[in-house]
């Protein structure tokens, strides 16, 4: 969230869906954007739905993905309902399905500073270190203040957990004739290299618990947000971000779009996804 908009209209960061809906209404009433999502991109739709579902019942979400709980379960149907409500309640911006995240949506938030809120992952913290002049002004200019926050989607008093994924993995070829040299490089990447990518460039979240965070050139506001992300990544993890089942994932993506368009009900979407789940080889 870009806090200059919240300060301008005397608003607090929303902590649950009902508060989010009211904040978005206030922004809309004053000619501002509500919560921005690049819903043309399936990955952000799936990320958001999984966050909603994990907030309602983490165990059932991952059990359903593995084919052990039906997607027609009432908790999962509720997750589809909340996703659809984000469009019908005006939480997401008008025309969200027609714009992507990168860079249609991210430029408005990161470079123009023209939207109050955006849905994105912890990697967006890299904007604090972006050499682009517009980003520098938005994130490091006088009075700049941004906050990363999680949502209580079902208004039960508990914020959603985060989902995590491996972004880059390193491996040594079993047939290599220079395994020792390869390991030297891998070991460097895990330690000195990782320190450069995190503390020198803020390109990734730290994967090592023993890494001391001291990002060069990161302002106080950025440091606060980084510490928040690291804390959530350590102590509030729902599960994995990337599901292993391509056909099921595609069906979920399609149904999330249909829900956003209002062409299906949450119950109908659940039926379609459950059929795909039953047909999915695991």
Predicted regions: what is each one?
Residues 9, 133-203:
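Extracytoplasmic/periplasmic substrate-recognition and gating elements
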Residues 56-78, 133-141, 152-161, 212-220, ...:
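Short, solvent-exposed loop/beta-turn-alpha elements that line the ligand-binding surface or hinge
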Residues 8-13, 68, 85-101, 113-114, ...:
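A local structural motif
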Residues 17-22, 96-111:
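Short helix-initiation/N-cap motifs at beta->coil->alpha
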Residues 146-150, 199-254, 258:
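Long, aromatic- and glycine/proline-rich binding clefts that accommodate carbohydrate-like moieties
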Residues 24-26, 66-97, 147, 151:
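Glycine-centered hinge/linker elements that transmit conformational signals in sensory
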Residues 1-15, 21, 32, 38-65, ...:
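Periplasmic solute-binding protein
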Residues 31-33, 111-120:
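Alpha-to-beta junction loops
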């Amino acid at each position: 969230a870009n806090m200059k908009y919240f300060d301008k209209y005397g608003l607090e960061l929303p902590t649950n869906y009902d508060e989010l809906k009211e904040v978005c209404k206030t922004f809309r009433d004053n000619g501002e954007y509500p919560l921005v999502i690049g819903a043309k991109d399936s990955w952000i739709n799936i990320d958001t739905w999984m966050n909603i579902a994990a907030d309602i019942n983490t165990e059932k979400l991952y059990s359903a993905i593995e084919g052990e709980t039906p997607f027609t379960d009432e908790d999962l149907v509720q997750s589809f309902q909340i996703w659809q409500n984000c469009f019908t309640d005006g939480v997401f911006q008008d025309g969200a399905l027609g714009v992507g995240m990168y860079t249609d949506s991210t430029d408005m938030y990161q470079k123009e500073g023209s939207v109050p809120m955006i849905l994105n992952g912890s990697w967006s913290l890299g904007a604090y270190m972006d050499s682009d002049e517009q980003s520098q002004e938005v994130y490091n200019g006088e009075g700049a203040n941004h906050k990363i926050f999680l949502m209580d989607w079902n208004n039960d008093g508990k914020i959603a957990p985060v989902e995590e994924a491996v972004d880059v993995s390193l491996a040594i070829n079993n047939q290599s004739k220079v395994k020792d040299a390869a390991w030297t490089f891998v070991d460097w990447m895990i330690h000195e290299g990782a320190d450069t990518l995190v503390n020198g460039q803020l390109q990734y979240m730290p994967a090592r618990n023993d890494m001391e965070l001291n990002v060069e050139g990161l302002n106080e506001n950025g440091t606060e947000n980084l510490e928040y992300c690291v804390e959530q990544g350590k102590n509030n993890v729902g599960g994995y971000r990337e599901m292993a089942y391509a056909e099921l994932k595609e069906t979920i993506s399609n149904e999330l779009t249909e829900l956003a368009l209002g062409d299906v009900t949450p119950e109908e979407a659940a039926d379609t996804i459950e059929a795909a789940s039953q047909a999915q080889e695991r």
